[in-house]
C-alpha cells in the first residue's frame, strides 16, 4: 500500500493514471483513472450549483456507479454526501432530508417519484436525475482535463452524514470527516487484510457505513476493484461472485441468514471468495457459510459513530468479538460508572452472572474521536458523558479477557427482576432450521414489568408448528427460564431497515396487533404456544386496564 493520506480527496488523486479496474458492473467497467475523472466532473457540477449554507448533497440511488462517482466528486469539491435511505417513506423521509440541509438531491426517475409530494424545501432545479439525458450533458460539460486539488480541503472537512439504522429508535445523522474515513481505510486494511489485488463485492447499501468504511474506503486506499450489484440478492450472490471473481464482501447478519436459506449446491465452494466482514451474524450461520463457501468471515464490532474498540484474536471462543483494543475499552454500569465483573460462562457459553457482568461498552479515551451528530446536541450529550464515549451497546468480558457484544442498550429486557439480552435470545432462535431472521424485544406485562416477545421470519408461516417450536426451545440448554418468548409473531417478511437489519421498534409498536399470526405461551413450565384470536388479544389488553397499566399500551 502507498503512503497513508489524510483525506479522501488526496487518496483519489493517487488513483489518477491508475489503469487497474476501479469499478465494475455487469454492464460496464471503469479504470481507477476513469473513476477519478468521472468524480471530478461531478464535483465540478456540485461546485457550479453551490449556494450559501452547508455544502450537503443528498444521494438517493441504489448501488450504482453514479453513487460512487458522487462520493468521489463530493470529496474533491469539499462537499458532504448524505446517503438517503430508500426504505424511508412519507413524513419520515421528508423530515430526514430537511433535517440535513441538502442543497442538491441526486437521484433517478424512480427515486424522484418516491419524493413526489414531499416538501423538501428545494426547487425542481435542485434535483439531478442521473437517467435524464440533460444530466448526461451537464456532466459532460463539466469534464475536467486535469483535476486540481482544492487547498481548502483537509482532514477536518465534513465528508459524510450517515443516518443511523434506527432499529430501536429515531435515526440520527452521524458526522464523518474525510480524515476519519481515511484513517478507517488504513486501519481496516491492516485489520482485514485488504490488498490491491482484491476484487470487492459491494452488496450492502452505499448509504450505510458498512459498505463505505469496511469496503469502499479500503478499496480506494489500495486501488482494489469495487463490483456493484444494484442491491443485495441471496440468489444472485454466488453468480455475481463468480462473474466478477470477487475475493471480499461485507454483510450484516440478516443478509447472511438469507444466503444460508438458499438451497445448498454441490459446487458452492467453486468460487473465488477469500474473506468477508460483517456484524451480528449468528454463530451457526457463520459456521455454515465457511463450510459451504470456503471463505473466512471476520465478525466485527463497530458503528457509524465510532470503531476500533476491538482487537481480533484467532483464539477467541465462538461468539466473542476479540479482545478490548486497549485498557480504555471497558464494560461499566451506566448509572454508577463502576466497571462490571468478569462474566462466568457455562459450557454452552451462557452468562451465569448477567446482572453483575453485562453493562454498557465505553471508551474512556474515545470522546475526542467522536465527531458528533448533525444538529443534535442532546444525542451528542448522551454519547459523551463524564469525558467518556458511551457506545449505547451492551457487552461483557469473560474471565479470559475476551469481549462480547450483548445487544443494543434498548434491547435489555427486564423480566421478574432479572435482565435478559434480546440478542442472546435471537441467537438461540436462529438455530431453528426454519427461522430465517428474528427480532426479540420487550412488550409490557399487564401486571408488572415486561415480557419477552419474538418475531420470526419463515418461508411459509402456514407451515409453522407451535408444538415443534416449543419442543425446540425446551431443548436449548442455554435458554434461561425468563428468556423464552411469551409471544411469538410468525411472518413471511419482517420489516427491515435499508441496511437489512430487523426494524424492532416497528415490531415493538405493533406488538400482537398485526396481521401476522401471533402465538402466546400458555400454562406454566414447559413451553406451549397457542395462536391468539382477536378476542383473546382484546381480553389481554383489558387486563392492562384492570391493573391500571393501560398507558403502557400506548408507549
Curated annotation (Swiss-Prot):
- What triggers expression? Up-regulated on cholate.
Q: What is its EC number?
A: 6.2.1.-
Could you name the domain of life of the organism this protein comes from? Bacteria
Q: What pathway is it annotated to?
A: Steroid metabolism
Mind listing the GO biological process terms from this record? long-chain fatty acid import into cell; steroid metabolic process
Print the keywords alphabetically. ATP-binding, Ligase, Lipid metabolism, Nucleotide-binding, Steroid metabolism
Do you know which InterPro entries this protein is assigned to? AMP-bd_C (IPR025110), AMP-bd_C_sf (IPR045851), AMP-binding_CS (IPR020845), AMP-dep_synth/lig_dom (IPR000873), ANL_N_sf (IPR042099)
What is any one of the record's Gene Ontology cellular component terms?
plasma membrane
MF annotations from Gene Ontology? ATP binding; long-chain fatty acid transmembrane transporter activity; long-chain fatty acid-CoA ligase activity
Reaction(s) catalysed by this chain's protein: 3-oxochol-4-en-22-oate + ATP + CoA = 3-oxochol-4-en-22-oyl-CoA + AMP + diphosphate; 3-hydroxy-9-oxo-9,10-seco-chola-1,3,5-trien-22-oate + ATP + CoA = 3-hydroxy-9-oxo-9,10-seco-chola-1,3,5-trien-22-oyl-CoA + AMP + diphosphate
Q: Give one Pfam family, short name only.
A: AMP-binding_C
Record's keyword annotation contains Repeat: no
Matching entries from PANTHER family are given as:
FATTY ACID TRANSPORT PROTEIN 3, ISOFORM A (PTHR43107:SF15), LONG-CHAIN FATTY ACID TRANSPORT PROTEIN (PTHR43107)
Primary role: Involved in cholate catabolism. Catalyzes the ATP-dependent formation of CoA thioesters of steroids with isopropanoyl side chains, likely occurring as degradation intermediates. Can use 4-BNC, HSBNC and HIDP as substrate.
Family membership, please give it. Belongs to the ATP-dependent AMP-binding enzyme family.
- In its UniProt entry, what is this protein called? Steroid-22-oyl-CoA synthetase
Organism the protein comes from: Rhodococcus jostii (strain RHA1)
Supply the gene name. Answer: casI
